[in-house]
């Protein structure tokens, strides 16, 4: 789960022990290698691949969206350009029909974009207003195969009944921000959303204060009108009926009969954030269509969990380690946030703990 504080405060308060300028000993499966794509960034978060292949990246703390192009195709960013600045904690990014969409904490804006742009040529157009800040401050934007815009917003709290229906949910809008309505509810903090094969997938950060092992972190397949349990229920076994949260104690166990369970689970408090489906051409065939998830890492577990990238089979729900080494003993040497598949088939991973973007490529 995500701590309900701004990142810098969270690192200090949670005792993560994140040392400055660490170079982690990152491990990936045989046949892969890890290299540095970019560094010297200010808590980089989510990425998007532009139509021409440039990598766009959000820096919420600095209020900027950066461009990290690799036009000489050497596997490293050629430069760092500021596409837009003065934004309000920008997080999720998406390209659609000649625009770059940016999910600020208080709403979604878009900038006109043409292939190769590294600086916005016009001002931001605000499309959607969202409840800003409030604990889970990130907002994520994604476009579906239907051309609609999907926006994820987290809760204000650890566990509560929200008064604003935009909280703890995914809403769907027309591309211009009109005709918004709830798409999926009962998701405490769905930081990562991604379409694949006609299905919208989501990561979710479960509640705190139930000990080291409850609830497990869940990965979900969302459907229009679906309810996914929070704050009344949570999944303890993948694909099995959710259980009633007796500690919260609102409503009843019958409520959980209507809650769709997670199709896959991982260790409690590991904080799943961004996800990406591998659709590139350079990994072995067995990785095609696999889901990769960045586990940002726990802040309140006696033995830390997360701090790695996992591979999730969208059919079986099997979860396995793919990229480890961000945690040395109980000391974090980085915190993975988001992933995208680059045009050359490499997997890029942001690390907001050390201000880097890592590149994983098949050898």
Q: How should each PLM-predicted stretch be described?
A:
Residues 22-28, 138, 155-158, 168, ...:
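Beta-propeller domain segments
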Residues 94, 106-144, 152-156, 179:
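Asp-box/WD-like beta-propeller blade repeats and closely related beta-sheet repeat scaffolds
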Residues 73-79, 116-118:
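Acidic, glycine-anchored loop motifs typical of Ca2+
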Residues 340-363:
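Blade-level signature of beta-propeller repeat domains, shared across WD40, Kelch, NHL, RCC1
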Residues 36-41, 81-86, 127-133, 181-186, ...:
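Surface loop/turn motifs at the tips and blade-to-blade linkers of beta-strand repeat domains
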Residues 54-58, 99-102, 148-152, 199-203, ...:
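Conserved beta-propeller blade signature
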Residues 43, 79, 86-89, 96, ...:
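Beta-rich catalytic cores
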Residues 47, 93, 141, 190-193, ...:
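Hydrophobic core register within WD40 beta-propeller blades
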